[in-house]
Structures are given as C-alpha cells and as structure tokens.
Amino acid sequence: MLKRSSWLAALLGLLTVVSTSTHTYAIELDEATRTVPLESSGRTVILTPEQVKRGKRLFNNSCAICHNGGITKTNPNIGLDPESLGLATPQRDTIEGLVDYMKDPTSYDGAESIAELHPSIKSAEIFPKMRNLTDEDLFTIAGHILLQPKIVSEKWGGGKIYY
C-alpha cells in the first residue's frame, strides 16, 4: 500500500509541475507582422492571433492539398507569393482581392471564369471543402496567405527548391 501511495504522490506532483508550467512553443507575431493589405487603396488590417491560427487551420484543410508552401501544383509558374498575386488581373495581393478570387476565381489575366476548375464558393457543389466557408473564413484564409511571406520569406511560393 505504501508503494502505491508513493507512486500516486509522485504522479500528482508531476501533474502539478506540468500544469503550472507556461511554455509557449508557437511563434509570437507582433502587430507589424500581422498587418496585411486589406484593399488596393492601401488600407491595412491587423489580424488577431485567433485569426492567424484559424486562417492557417482553414488553409491547411481547404487549400494546402494544391497550394502547400504557397505553390500551385497544377501550374507551378503561378504561386501565392506576393509578386505573382500582385501581377494578376485583377490584383490578388490584398484580403479583398483574394476573397473575391475564392468566391469566383478567374484566369490569371482575369479574362475568363475558372470556377469549374478551381475550388471556390461559386463551385461549392463540385468542391465540397468550400461548402461551409463563410466570408470570415475566407478573410482569415486570405490573411494567412498574405502573412506567410513575412514569416517564411522567399520559401512561400518558392517551389521545389524549398520543399
């Protein structure tokens, strides 16, 4: 009985130490890092830490199968890096531009709809991962895409040489 109670006391002591330690292993992002372009007029928005986490989770669940690391598996010439997003027509280097694209995607030159080829809200019946995404979800996914170049720099959208 004494052995059992000493093991129990040791286990409780260990649990107490583990539960009171406050280690944070996630990267802490300051406001400057979490600031991303909202619209083409130059307005910006500061993402909350919760939006950052949610955007990453939603991107990984809905987009990363084709865009892991900011690449585009079906067209390696066009990635999610800031340069590619900024050169698209219409530009997609803002939250507003990316949300519009996720709702109704167009070709890189903006000439034609590609909703039947690219997952979007418009084609949610074909791409079920898009079905339940709200405008807030799209906002946080766009925030994640625009935040990544600040965190992983040229690796985001850099392609095979980095991944």
Curated annotation (Swiss-Prot):
Recorded superkingdom: Eukaryota
Organism: Pyropia yezoensis (Susabi-nori)
Cofactor remark from the record: Binds 1 heme c group covalently per subunit.
Residues annotated as binding heme c: C63, C66, H67, H118
Entries under NCBIfam families matching the protein: PS_II_C550 (TIGR03045)
Name this polypeptide is given: Photosystem II extrinsic protein V
Localization terms from the record: Plastid, Chloroplast thylakoid membrane
Similarity field: Belongs to the cytochrome c family. PsbV subfamily.
Keyword Electron transport: yes
GO molecular function terms noted in the UniProt entry: electron transfer activity; heme binding; iron ion binding
Gene: psbV
GO annotation (BP), single: respiratory electron transport chain
Any GO CC annotation of this UniProt entry: photosystem II
